[in-house]
Amino acid sequence: IVHTQGWIHCHSSATDASGLVKAIMDELFDYFVKFKLESKLKIAVGCCINMGGAVHCSDLAVVGVHTKLPKVDNTKLKATCEIPSTIKSCPTGAIRKNPEGDGLVVNKERCMFCGNCY
């Protein structure tokens, strides 16, 4: 099983792969050690959609995906984020300056839940 370490190094991870890999291997262990499979099986666990876990070249892949729109707390934003960097991190342009005042807004229709802004 190929996997990434998720939260240790990835800024956009949706999960940490270590627990998932342990659970998968606990279930499949007998298949691997007793050679019950017809051929080699490549399994990958990716923490995000950026393919750090080689999910694109595996037979079976488990990928963590963000499913909720990022929440913006405009009262804490200036103390925790570089606003221009946060805006630029969005590949679809879903994050914009708030036209009604300070802070940012997220366009729900444009957000692809990549996690770059987290």
At which residue positions do the language-model features occur?
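Small-residue-enriched alpha-helical segments and adjacent helix-cap loops
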Residues: 1-80
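Cysteine-centered iron-sulfur cluster-binding motifs in ferredoxin-type domains/subunits
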Residues: 7, 47-51, 71-93, 104-118
